[in-house]
């Protein structure tokens, strides 16, 4: 995100059956930093925000039929959150594993120069983490993989 508070940005929101537990777990497992927690009169979580670098993640409770945890949907994910690290992806994966994440894909270097892993959180959300290991020009992976890279379809 920009230093300009009015600059446009993209944030993700994830929903949990137990968002309070999720906040604690996401901090422990992935290193996300809580930045705002709003509770209602009964002490239930109304809204929360976490930061990771310049990124914003909102963590909330299930609040409609269209805002559900993967756990409530039989483990179905319609999207994942990708988090790009600057360094330490293997250690990050081990941290997540120690916190109880199921590692769906061990750290592996991809054809485009990033090393990635995938993890499942306690309520079934899939998280992908990446770190650029080698800066590669698209022409390099096109040649190696037989792919075509362009800006638009």
Q: Residue spans of the language-model regions?
A:
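Vicinal oxygen chelate
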Residues: 1-13, 23-24, 30-120, 130-153
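Short acidic-aromatic low-complexity motifs
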Residues: 16-20
């Amino acid at each position: 995100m920009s230093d300009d508070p009015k600059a446009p940005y993209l944030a993700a929101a994830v929903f949990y059956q137990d968002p309070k537990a999720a906040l604690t777990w996401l901090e422990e497992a992935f290193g996300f930093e809580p930045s705002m927690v709003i509770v209602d009169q009964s002490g239930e979580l109304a809204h929360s925000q976490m930061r990771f670098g310049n990124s914003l993640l909102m963590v909330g409770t299930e609040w409609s039929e269209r805002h559900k945890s993967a756990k409530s949907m039989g483990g179905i994910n319609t999207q994942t959150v990708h988090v790009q690290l600057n360094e330490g992806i293997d250690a990050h994966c081990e941290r997540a594993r120690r916190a109880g994440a199921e590692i769906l894909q061990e750290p592996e270097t991809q054809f485009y120069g990033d090393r990635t892993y995938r993890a499942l959180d306690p309520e079934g959300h899939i998280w992908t983490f990446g770190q650029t290991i080698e800066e590669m020009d698209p022409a390099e992976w096109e040649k190696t993989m037989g792919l075509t890279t362009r800006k638009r379809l």
